[in-house]
């Protein structure tokens, strides 16, 4: 195959970079200088529960992770409180906190700076790890409604306040200016909308769709459409989807996707709130039927990757990875068969575009009341690189350490470096974090960090 000058130059630059890095590593090991940080990981340790962090460095002995507690993180009661989801917005991490008393003990959120800064250089960035993580603000009391789901839409962080039938918005603008003197109230804004176990989908910082989980009654299939402009209170409306039990919502390419008890429903995003409940066209995508129960197949969570929406459904031989091209004129469900052993269930996909342009979905086979060996499947989403994911297929399957599932927590987790060179996976059951090279898809290192590492974010790298 003929090599173009551009490709030859890229390969030469890569070789020079690798050679320089190898020499730097050698110099570090002989001179005693501090190893260069490749990325920073922040993770939840549910054994305490505490928030931990470490820079990932490479020395003569390979990758190194040295766990430390985040200084100033509020002390949680492990018997009464637990972590829920967390999100990163340009280096600021927001962590949700749940309690076991319907929010009447202390629930809410904590915002912290990762301590990592980005120096952009056109087609790449340099990352600086000069400061440790620091707490910016927190809100833990009896008024936060026991959040469970945390989302990042366009850099804004949304927390679903289940017991208050509403959600909290922490805007990207406010987060970007946050510092040690920031007050929680200056960051957060509450909106009424949604009910029960709420899921959220927001578009263009203008509108948010908030679901109700009711399976019957007057709120079955209800979705509240809420304006985010504080100058437009009371101008929203409510939709009614064909089926209830809503658990899952996302926004992609100007469309909103929902996960009810039957398949997938979607609507065009009403950013200007110009429609009425009876004028909204509700579109339905069937996922088929569960062969064991005869009930319609469903999902419980979505992942966005570019203009694609990914999720899993089914069990055992009928287990499937589903992909929807959200920008298509007529969205359909592209199904990739992924049979799974009895006693395991696929997790929600986590997606990455690597430094070389490959696109992968990482999906764990986690235990469901069984002792079956767990695994990680890595799906090549676009083997022929034509932008169409219809040829997606499992590229690699790896054994992993054990999970330690309690409620919604304790699943395997994965997060990726910003450069698309590394994946880091947490094995809650044996207290390890593994690093996987995204060029070889092989495990590069396994580090015992102790405790029960679970949800994580990676900043920089």
PLM feature spans:
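Post-signal peptide N-terminal segment of secreted/secretory-pathway proteins
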Residues: 47-166
């Amino acid at each position: 195959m003929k090599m173009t000058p551009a490709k030859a130059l890229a390969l030469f630059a890569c070789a020079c970079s690798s050679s320089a890095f190898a020499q730097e590593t050698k110099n570090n090991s002989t001179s005693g200088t501090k190893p260069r940080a490749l990325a920073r990981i922040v993770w939840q340790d549910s054994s305490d529960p505490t928030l931990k962090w470490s820079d990932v460095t490479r020395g003569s002995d390979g990758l190194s992770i040295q766990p430390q507690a985040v200084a100033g993180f509020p002390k949680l009661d492990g018997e009464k409180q637990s972590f829920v989801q967390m999100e990163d917005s340009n280096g600021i991490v927001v962590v949700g906190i749940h309690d076991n008393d319907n929010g009447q003990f202390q629930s809410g959120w904590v915002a912290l700076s990762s301590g990592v800064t980005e120096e952009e250089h056109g087609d790449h960035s340099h990352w600086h790890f000069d400061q440790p993580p620091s707490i910016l603000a927190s809100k833990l009391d009896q008024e936060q409604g026991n959040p469970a789901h945390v989302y990042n839409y366009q850099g804004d962080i949304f927390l679903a306040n289940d017991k208050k039938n509403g959600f909290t918005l922490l805007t990207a603008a406010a987060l970007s200016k946050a510092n040690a003197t920031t007050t929680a109230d200056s960051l957060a804004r509450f909106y009424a909308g949604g009910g029960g176990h709420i899921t959220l989908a927001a578009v263009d910082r203008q509108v948010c769709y908030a679901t109700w989980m009711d399976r019957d009654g007057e709120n079955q299939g209800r979705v509240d459409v809420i304006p985010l402009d504080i100058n437009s209170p009371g101008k929203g409306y409510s939709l009614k989807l064909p089926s209830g039990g809503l658990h899952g919502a996302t926004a992609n390419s100007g469309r909103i996707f929902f996960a009810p008890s039957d398949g997938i429903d979607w609507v065009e995003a009403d950013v200007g709130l110009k429609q009425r409940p009876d004028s909204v066209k509700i579109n339905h995508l069937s996922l088929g039927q569960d062969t064991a129960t005869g009930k319609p197949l469903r999902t419980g969570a979505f992942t966005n990757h570019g203009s694609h929406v990914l999720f899993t459904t089914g069990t055992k031989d009928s287990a499937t990875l589903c992909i929807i091209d959200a920008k298509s004129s007529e969205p359909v469900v592209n199904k990739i068969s992924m049979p799974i052993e009895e006693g395991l269930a696929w997790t929600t996909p986590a997606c990455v575009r690597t430094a070389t342009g490959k696109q992968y979905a990482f999906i764990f086979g986690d235990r469901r009341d069984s002792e079956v060996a767990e695994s990680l499947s890595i799906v090549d989403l676009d083997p022929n690189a034509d932008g169409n994911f219809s040829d997606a297929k499992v590229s690699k399957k790896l054994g992993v350490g054990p999970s330690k599932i309690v409620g919604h927590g304790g699943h395997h987790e994965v997060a990726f470096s910003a450069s698309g060179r590394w994946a880091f996976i947490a094995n809650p059951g044996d207290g390890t974090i593994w690093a996987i090279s995204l060029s070889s898809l092989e495990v590069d290192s396994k580090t015992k960090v102790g405790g029960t590492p679970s949800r994580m974010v990676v900043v920089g790298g």
